[in-house]
From Swiss-Prot:
One of its GO terms (biological process) is protein neddylation. Residues 62-268 form the DCUN1 domain. Pfam families: Cullin_binding (PF03556), UBA_4 (PF14555). This is Defective in cullin neddylation protein 1.
């Protein structure tokens, strides 16, 4: 049985996507726990090859004045035609007013929510208004509640945690599809060190394990991290959260990226295992 609220979400989904199939709308929404933004993301990725600004342009809304005003408070003029966007300075102020610091893990959730492609591009007016409007958040307080929910999910929802972890690679990747090792290490510390107590319900990596992984990359002069290594490291840490776990359970025949195999050899050569 579909509730009245769910029916309204289905109508909104169909209106935004021009999808005439009610069953398809229901499937995408139910698969994403009736979160319309996640449902839209999945729909555009699978049905039309990704979300673009064209989707925002096709669906013009009368945005609430308080939401428009909030964007204007943090935005700066960056084009001669008067186009406004939130630049890094404005973003720092925005995040602080939400009660967070730029280094907090949940800020990656914010970037993911706003569909930021990288850390260099500013946040456009269309981006900011469109996504917050569809989430029903028009004030800082409402946005803060949304991010608090994201924090909770980072602590107890493995699928969501994995999504944000993998997204952080794309956020920092170069045009060649790699991330500099120094940057990768900072993010690994963010995910597995500074937040290890909060995230102990999701994943807990022993400090010695994480430190040796980072030292291995630096000792072996691994300057770039590829996406497969990034993604598989999360599963590696999940399966082997400690050096003892590697010692007793690691199987060299298992299919891990070459860099992780090298890490195992590095540990053996130094008699760590």
């Amino acid at each position: 049985m579909v509730s009245r609220h769910e029916k309204e979400l289905m109508k909104t989904f169909q209106s935004l996507t021009s999808c005439t199939d009610e069953g398809k709308a229901k499937r995408y929404l139910s698969a994403n726990n009736w979160n319309i933004n996640y449902a839209l993301n999945e729909y555009y990725d699978k049905e039309v090859g990704g979300f673009t600004e064209d989707h925002m342009i096709r669906h013009q809304f009368k945005y609430p004045d308080e939401l428009v005003s909030l964007f204007g408070h943090y935005a700066a003029l960056i084009e001669e035609d008067g186009t406004q966007s939130i630049t890094p300075d404005g973003l720092i102020d925005y995040i602080q007013d939400l009660g967070y610091n730029l280094e907090d893990l949940v800020t990656i959730s914010l970037a993911h929510f706003l569909q930021c492609k990288n850390l260099e591009n500013p946040i456009t007016e269309k981006q900011f208004l469109y996504f917050w409007y569809n989430e029903g958040c028009y004030t800082l307080e409402q946005m803060r509640h949304y991010l608090e929910d994201c924090e909770r999910k980072l602590c107890n929802d493995w699928k969501y945690f994995t999504t944000i972890y993998n997204y952080s690679f794309d956020l920092n990747a170069s045009k060649q599809g790699v991330v500099e090792t120094d940057i990768a290490i900072e993010y690994w510390k963010l995910f597995f060190e500074e937040n290890r107590t909060k995230l102990s319900g999701i994943i807990k990596v022993d400090q010695a394990h994480l430190d040796l992984w980072c030292k291995f990359l630096q000792d072996e002069h691994k300057k770039l991290i590829h996406k497969d290594t990034w993604q598989m490291l999360l599963l590696f840490f999940k399966k082997f959260p400690s050096l003892d776990a590697i010692k007793t359970e690691y199987n060299e025949a298992d299919a891990w990226p070459y860099t992780i195999d090298e890490f195992y050899e590095y540990l053996e050569e130094r008699n760590v295992l």
